[in-house]
Amino acid sequence: MNQNEETLVQALHRGDRYACNDLVEQYSSKIYHVALKLTGHPTEAEEILQETFINACKGAEKFEGRSSLGTWLYRIATNNGLMRLRKKQMPTVPLEMPVDREDQSSFWPRQLEDWAWDPEKITLTDELRQAMDEAVETLPENLRAVFVLRDLEGLSTKEAAEVLGISASNAKVRLHRA
């Protein structure tokens, strides 16, 4: 951890309200990029970004300094993103599906399908980037997370492993599989 990070962490521990602003200014673009690559949706990435900084500012005392401040934020963002991906994997139910009134457990669908039109996806013109994004989205979440952190965000294998709470050798195996 460099001197600048130490000063910022001390200010966060003291509850300095400007320290959170500094934290957001310093890391928001990197965290947003990770969240976007994990989810593939700008709106969800923004929500993850907000959740990450809320969690970080409220839980600053939990930061022990064993890693860099950026690595800690990546971990929070990755955990938030993976939780969202897990929620998304719940079965979806079309709105037209008949409801069995006798079986109350099937009365409410677990998750409705999102049919919203996303103009950003439609206007993507770079075919290579689109193909890469599509390929990343098809990866299972455990492989996607390590791939995004190391190969797209530029973290070292060791740093990506720290963020995900796995060993460096496990990260290498996951990268190989991705």
Model-predicted segments: where are they?
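DNA major-groove recognition helix of helix-turn-helix
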Residues: 49, 85, 175
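Amphipathic, Lys/Arg- and hydrophobic-enriched alpha-helical face
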Residues: 24-42, 59, 136, 142
